[in-house]
Amino acid sequence: VILDDLGNENKRMLKEKFQEEREFDFTAQDFARVRKLIYQHAGISLSDAKTDMVYSRVGRRIRTVGLNSFKDYLDWLESDQNEGEWENFTNALTTNLTSFFREEHHFPILAEHIKKLAKPIRIWCSASSTGEEPYTIAMTACEAFGTLKPPVEIIATDIDTNVLATAARGVYPFDRVSKLSEKRKKEFFQKGSGAQEGLVRVRNELRNLISFQQLNLLDNQWPIKEPFDAIFCRNVMIYFDKPTQSKILKKFVPLMKPHALLFAGHSENFLYVSTDLQLLGKTVYELKHGDGQKRQL
């Protein structure tokens, strides 16, 4: 009985959450519909705790296109003539938390790894966000080889076209690089002046190492054929359910060279959803080998 009461209380609280004073009509059915659509389109699983986030972010789109309710917007979204709005819808619900040298322990491992490889070296950053991660990979490659023109090709992809545009520009507020060493700031960035005061731009040599392109990890076919020496898929899987995680990891396997490393986020464990990988170190994986041997990092 107590458990039933708790369940009813949770339902009551959720109902009240949807009945709060809001600019747009937003029902539990609308929220369920948003969850279903973003899961089908981008594989993102939204919990009940995301109601306010959904209202806020999708509400901005409703305001922009001049509609009056979530139902009207979602009907319009699904109509044949509005394919372009799917991109805006997906961008609105994508979270982009990132920084330069985030989860820093990965980059000395990457540096040692790529110094041993045949050239040229291919690296895939599968969730580029606003560019800090692929530029960090590029900086690591430059430092590993002692040149601004290392033998490295970096493919950086993301589902969100807005953040990809930011990444390709390579322009950031100065506080984004404030925690980098003075040496790195001087070597890899140019400080803005005049109208660009307070901004920094990634040096062209770094940007030339990276090819940015839109890619949905949920797509059946990826526009990528050649295998990689390293793949970064960090803090992405936490937004997907386990079947989706397993599907994506299985598609990584043929894109990994025999010696390739796969880097995960700090709260992600790929061993639960893949039988093709083995753990090398803290959130660093490689393909399983027939002899059962494991490299030392």
Regions found by a protein language model. Give the residues of each.
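A short glycine-rich, Lys/Arg-flanked "PGG" loop and its adjoining helix->strand segment in the class I
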Residues: 246-258
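Short conserved AdoMet
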Residues: 118, 172, 257
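Conserved class I S-adenosyl-L-methionine
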Residues: 120-133, 153-155
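Class I S-adenosyl-L-methionine
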Residues: 268-297
